[in-house]
Amino acid sequence: MDRNTLLAFFLIAIVLIFTPMYMETFSPSPEPAIVEDTGLDSTHGLPIGKKPNATKTVKQKPEVFQLTSPTKADLEEKLIELETNLYNATVSTKGGGSIVSFSFKNYFDQDSQQVNLINGINKENLSIRFQNLDGDPINLGKNWSYNGFLGGSINSKETLKFSTEISPGQFITKSLTFRPDSYVIDISVDAQKVQSQVFSGNYSIGWYGGLPPTEKNEKDDFVYFKSYVFQGGELEEVKIKEGETESQSFNGSTDWVAIRTKYFITSLVPNNPGQVTSAAIGGSFSDREAYDMEVLLPASDISNISLYLGPL
């Protein structure tokens, strides 16, 4: 994590804390929005790769094909429990390192329980997706191979490395690096060996299902629920109403994408913004608001991204 990444996280906090205050003070009353009916399911991600300011679209829930290793039986799930000075986290081998629990040591809910930012809706986080050469969507959500740190308290940075075999001898690897005194988790993805099997040569990594409310008065928390993308000095956001579903995709270099609640945020910050092909944000509101974000990256290069999961 370099100085530019630290600066990016600082700017994210400044933008997201002060933008709502500015809008409340200076923005005119919004005109009623005309909402088109859409069918995008938040749990299946975003239609990445569209042009900027993409309109809402109607689409059927896509069938998601799970890749399995052609040479190995399905692997059993492994759970790696980590304790840092700031939080306790549990990482699953599903999807090559999805975070299935993330509870803070210094933040508590109305029942005096540690705030946990992971629930049943957003367990599909940090997942990698792409289309095969036939254009079929691929979700690498099964268990990946892992033989490393078994869990426990960490006093220095600890890297968890996962891999999955797409075809004989061709692997995708993903690593997550944790630090004892930071909410930042560094992510590295190497898909170079499978780039010939990736349609358009790009894959996505994203966070789906947003963050749960943590306030006793959930309605007050929901006011702040949004997803954001920051490109070229411009901030775009998605805020949905009950019954709505919306997604927007933006081509080109991306500084960061984020999902926030009143007090917490999850954000993906590419180490090299120019490496990003496009970014997408969106959300749906049926039983509750849930927001998504993802970035599209080239399989031809190793990609390094920082995840911030913590307080604003």
Whereabouts are the PLM-identified features?
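Subset of Sec-pathway N-terminal targeting signals
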Residues: 1-42, 166
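A ubiquitous, low-specificity "background" feature that marks scattered single residues
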Residues: 8-10, 21, 47, 112, ...
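A generic alpha-helix propensity feature with a strong bias for hydrophobic helices
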Residues: 23, 31-35, 50, 55, ...
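Acidic, low-complexity intrinsically disordered tails
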Residues: 33-74
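Soluble non-transmembrane domains of integral membrane proteins
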Residues: 74-312
